[in-house]
Amino acid sequence: MGEPPRRPRELFLAGLAAAYLAAFVSLYLQIPGLYGRDGILPARRVLRLSGKGLWEQLRDVPTLLWLGPQLGLDTEQGMELLCLLGAVASMGALLCAPLRDCLLFAVLRVFYLSLYQVGQVFLYFQWDSLLLEAGFLAVLVAPLRLFKWRSTAWRPHDSVTFWLVRWLLFRLMFASGVVKLTSRCPTWWGLTALTYHYETQCIPTPAAWYAHQLPVWFQKFSVVATYVIEIAVPLLFFMPIRRLRLFAFYCQVLLQILIILTGNYNFFNALTIVLAFSLLDEEHMGRWMGRGKRKHGSSAWPPTLLSFLSTLLELATYALLLYWSVHYFSLEIDWEKGLLESKVAFTYHEFTQWLRAVTLPLVGLGFLSLSWEILSALYRCACVRGFFWKLWATLQWAVFATATVGMFAISLVPFTYIDYESNGKLWPGIHQMFSAVERFQVVNSYGLFRRMTGVGGRPEVVLEGSYDKQSWTEIEFMYKPGNVSAAPAVVAPHQPRLDWQMWFAALAHHSSSPWFASFVHRLLQGKEDVIRLVQVDEDKYPFSTQPPVYLRAQLYKYWFTHSAESGAGAAQWWRRQHVQEFFPTVSVGDPTLDGLLAQHGLKDKLPLKRPVDAFLPWLLSSVRQLSRPFSPHVVLWSLYVVAATTCLLRAMARRPRGGAPPTRHKAPKQPRGDQGEKNGQLRRKEGREAEERGEGRSRGAADGEGPRGTKRRK
């Protein structure tokens, strides 16, 4: 029945720890400017004392920050403490395998959920929800290593809980592909979305400029490939043929790497690759590590009937995938022009009819795949040696299989949002279960890049400050486009959340972004924490010595320059055109500004006094001072370099040294027949005793775990 996914599981847990590290550190470096008492959206507004008991407060807003006052901390300091503890714990889990424990991942998940509850608009991104859901699954997937009385190399039910990660990946990718068509966006239906995407995404990379120069026919073909990878290929996640699953894995990795190269999407794409590790198996991971196991007789000829049928089905799947792509996107090579033509060959009505027809069958496909994993795990439990350990394994299987089925059932509600008719056919009890856990972000709906914005030019808000209303100076951000001569930044896995919200603000009227008035107000006040969100380097902020008296915001349209536009002067990455005023000229005390602040409850109130002699606030302040001189993305890169260097040095230390064989053993002695027989009997006896103590493996498990334990005892 196959091996439990021990190595893929460890890779998933390590990758998730790396994503948590990016999330905690990135947010920590932005807390004062975003959520501090002098920040844009002070977090204390969310947690208002109302006279309720602690449990009632936790029920309404589940966050550990309610406990802050008992530690002498306000809401901002509580957020900093959670981020620091989360960063330390995630770094430990990344570097040390024994720390990848279900209890530690439960703590990380509670920490991030606590931050999410007060994060307001700056934490309302799909990757934050994805991290919370993946973090909850990690609690089920990770072993309990707190007790060392039994080996935790693998558990018979590991493949059951790990299947939920695959199901999450399927929901993420399939929904992301489907919503592009259900949104009726003309660019996605016309296959021209990528001709706009590279220059209109929030924070492009320098590689995006070069990708934007690619010919239109290639951009359209890239959209077709995106549809195939996001809609068709995810169906292979549940195929019984492992080579099809590996093909699906590498397709997903290719797509995510290309997105990473051309856009700054923080930890999102890396986290998606981490989820894709659920498609791997022990054999393939062993080949990655140079420890592949040879299957005797695997190269025998002629092949067995099962192997032949498997290969035939695999080839048929590839052929069907190719036919589906050519037929439904009218792929045709124009030999005279030397290009590949493509267009959508189906209508919106036909697509919605197809989606309605396949949504519930896809649920059935997922249920069948999960049922197979559950039965396979039960078989492995039956193969465990020793009555007590067999009973213990079966009890664990029952608990985790029930939890997995429950998670699968709850996830059907957000998954079927892609077709509301199918959503209405779900059992009412499933909707009730989902409503009960919805505020805990256990499962979520997904669907990225639903509509392509910026058609006709990328809208961009440019802030300008002045002392006299006559001469205006632009305020340039660290990351988002502004100066047309400045190259696009590379900041991932850091997410500059203010820059992202500036991108959303430019898509509508400023009244749709209430935080913007507070942002302008803080700049007029010269609040250092908010200024650091714009520029860490004071020399690059034009009003570092004295705050501006007046501020206004202009709306521009930005476009990437073309390669033919490069001249003899300084290279320009962008060209822009003024559109209109985005935010009127205001100053401190301006009635317009005060009215906007009062309308959204953002007017300054007398904050609570902080204790000055408490140890914990002093410690948090000291740590904050250490991070101030550095840019956030540099801090994150440095932490990852430290982690990578540590892992590399550890791997080099574990690698066996080459060179001449040791001289103390002249030659391996050949045991006499009777002595060799006694040694063999002794080894078999030790193996049986180990299995009876719980060290035993299922009969269907791979060889290789037991001998390691024997070597340690020797």
From Swiss-Prot:
A Gene Ontology BP annotation from the UniProt entry: protein maturation
GO CC annotations, alphabetized: endoplasmic reticulum membrane
Basic residues: compositionally biased ranges: 654-669
Pfam families in the cross-refs: LMF1 (PF06762), LMF1_C (PF25179)
Record's subcellular location: Endoplasmic reticulum membrane
Keyword Nucleotidyltransferase in annotation: no
Keyword field contains Phosphoprotein: no
Compositional bias annotation for Basic and acidic residues: 683-708
InterPro entries (UniProt xref): LMF (IPR009613)
Residue numbers spanned by region Disordered: 654-714
Membrane disposition: Multi-pass membrane protein
TM helices/strands, residue ranges: 11-31, 79-99, 103-125, 159-179, 221-241, 257-277, 304-324, 358-378, 398-418, 629-649
Keywords from the named record: Endoplasmic reticulum, Glycoprotein, Membrane, Transmembrane, Transmembrane helix
Glycosylation sites: N483
Role noted for this protein: Involved in the maturation of specific proteins in the endoplasmic reticulum. May be required for maturation and transport of active lipoprotein lipase (LPL) through the secretory pathway.
PANTHER family linked: LIPASE MATURATION FACTOR, LIPASE MATURATION FACTOR 2
Stated family: Belongs to the lipase maturation factor family.
Annotated protein name in UniProt: Lipase maturation factor 2
Gene behind this protein: LMF2
